[in-house]
Amino acid sequence: MLWSAIPLLLATFFSASAALQLYRIISRSYRSRKLSKQWNCEPVTSYPSGLFGHKAVWRLKTAAQEGQVGSTLHEGHLQYGNTLKLNLVGHDVVVTCEPENIQALLASQFSSFGLSKWRYPQYRPLLGGGIFTSDGSAWEHSRRLLRPQFTKNQIPSIEWFDSHSKNLMQELPPDGHIFDIQPLAFRLALDSATGYLFGKSISSLVKPNSNQTGIAETSDRRNEGFAAAFDYAQDILFKRTLALSYYWLIDSSEFRKSTRVVHKFVEYYVDKAIEYRSKINSPGDSLEQKGGEYCFLHALAAETQDRDFLRDQLVNVLLASRDDVASVLTSIFYLLGRDSVAWRKLKKEVTDAVDNHASNITLKEIQSLPYLRGVLYEALRLFPPVPVNARVAHHDTTIPVGGGPDGRSPVFISKGQMVAYSVWCLHRRPDIWGADAERFRPERWEEYNPPAWDFVPFNGGPRACLGQQFAIILISQQVFRLVQHLDSVESAQPGPDMGLNPPLRQTLTMCHENGVQLRIKRSKG
């Protein structure tokens, strides 16, 4: 008798579940329409996504394979408006490149938006509970401890930066030889990041054959291959991001192995920092013993000696420090290699600065060079390290513009809905940057000072990049020294000229899919 009743019980259960789900959908739809009318919202243009979003998913997948995600989104905005809605695997996502909306997401409505509920489980295997995966009070705690470590007083001396410049110059090939600058940019960025964060650079530019990405001090060489593991893990994290709630389907033993390699690399330094803090905090130590050069990790370990917390924060900061710098530095030479006029102008400015200051030029004076600043900012405008980002609504709310026929009415955003913002598209809008928006023209930065939310290469608001000042100084100094010692830089990129839309590989940050092939000639003397 009991067994015969099971089908009926199951049918009743599934019917009730379906009815409950239908009720929730109808109730949510009614509430959304009511609030939308109350808040004077208008519908946003829909991108043709297909059933369950299969067309949009396929288009983005194809764009990613071709390295054209940024240009594909840009085409979509040009055709359907600066704010649009698309469906991704059943989720309605609003995508915008409006400055007012980006300001709302990152600053003016900061408390209404946060990270996706999937961000932590998506990123946890590599980034743990670091500042890029946390939200709310956990994020506030991380930022409170990390922010003091990025003050101007902690910026290293020009001699520190020059030591890395010399290592990079030694790795450049003979005049006339074709080489890819992107791997060198990543090694330079890794060396400078580990030197600043851990107090000791791994010097991958100095000994690329013996232990390029490992730690020489460890006898078992467990950390060899760190950079490759870091790159692979980031690639998987990006795929988990695109999968939204289905992130758990993207996993593998190789992915888990790569995260262990990264963690062991960082834990080596964390353990040394904790040991260092315990020694200098012992009763017999004098203040003099606590002196020495600034070390980010040692300073952070003075605030907490929680091993997992320190490791997670260091992995997060290392990711941003290495990848952002390498991305921008590579893009600068992609642009300069294609523009001999811009190269000659920059070369003259650098040569004049060296002649005027002899060997005593300072970091501040390097940063004050207008054309160098223009070159850097144009690279950040055209190739932002993080071209696309997103936030999720904590509750039913709105974004300022994007609705209605003219796109100027508020748009209703329901609780849990994702709003993606494209910095790539924002930075290439002709109505903001002029008819030559998709042209590399450093002079525009001497003629035009854009409003704050028209130019956001490092995000903005409370979650703005903490290390942006360090990154700008490092990139400016490295470009200055390379231009100083090189007479010419020419593009040697194979294949058809892709202009300002070369194939780009998007993980958590952006890099050039095919690298940046150059041919150089050193300056005489």
Which residues does each predicted region cover?
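Conserved cytochrome P450 K-helix/beta-meander segment immediately N-terminal to the heme-binding cysteine loop
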Residues: 385, 407, 415, 421-448
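Short, small-residue alpha-helix embedded
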Residues: 324-337, 478
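N-terminal membrane-proximal hinge/A-helix region immediately C-terminal to the signal-anchor transmembrane segment
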Residues: 2-141, 155-156, 160-170, 188, ...
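Cytochrome P450 I-helix active-site segment
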Residues: 215-225, 283-291, 335-386, 393, ...
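Cytochrome P450 heme-binding "Cys pocket" and the immediately downstream C-terminal segment
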Residues: 174, 202-203, 340-342, 451, ...
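C-terminal helix/juxtamembrane-tail motif
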Residues: 509-525
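Cytochrome P450 heme-thiolate monooxygenase catalytic core
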Residues: 115-121, 157-329, 345
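Cytochrome P450 catalytic-domain "roof"
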Residues: 62-93, 116-134, 144-206, 265-283, ...
